[in-house]
Amino acid sequence: MIKTIVMSLLIFAGMVAYDSATSKPTPTTPPTKQEQQQQQINKHEKSAAMALFVSLLPDRKTWPSPMQKFYLAFNMEEVIDPIRQNPQWTPLKSMSQDIPKALIAIEDHDYYNHGAIAVDGVLRALLVNITAGEVVQGGSTLTQQFVKNVFLTHEQSMERKIEEAILSLMLEDNYTKDEILELYLNTTYFGAGANGIKQAANKYFGKAPSALSLAEAAVIAALPYAPSALNPLENPQDCKKRQLLVLAAMHKYGMINQAQLAEAKAERIRLSNGTRI
């Protein structure tokens, strides 16, 4: 048992070290056309090599779970590409920019500055929650949350956490921060049967994601933490409390100013069922 724990910690430490060594800051300029073409060539070469290798193996459904996860780490597009073809898909640039800002503020405020795994984020979240006297902030990055929701189960085990770490690192090696954020918002369950931002905006406000106000975006960002318990149609008071935490976080991290904070807090939001919060 002790040996297993020690090995698990060593593997996790290795993943964090790998992340620190390979994570790249968000580029200040978009890649050139030549760089984009080279990226596509590299991607196709990798896919072709993997396809040839896999063709020599038994049916993938018969592989042990660890082997399936290893394959998935290098072929994430098999899962992600179909998701992007969903008619409900909403590009990041086509939604109110208050939505991603609100989500980042409450779930992972340093999202654009750290890698797939933020060890300091776990410790910081613990301190914030102790200070607040309640769970205000989670320790997982948005990348880890997306991986857990789409590729893995919610099982609480050391094996699952290691798989989550590995897949998160591989995801950030192959997709940009904006792409991962867009994937997160289009796949997350927001409660009341709403999967993805388009369904959530329509379900709770009868609006498109592009039409949400700052106050409404803060409601949406409040939901991933506990989508059923915070469903504003069923639990408006609890949702309002969490929404105020989101707005406070946005102000704290410089995403909105004092006037915007005051206006959003004062807004009487009308939900799709006529309730105002």
What would you call each of these model-derived segments?
Residues 1-277:
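Juxtamembrane regions of bacterial inner-membrane/periplasmic proteins
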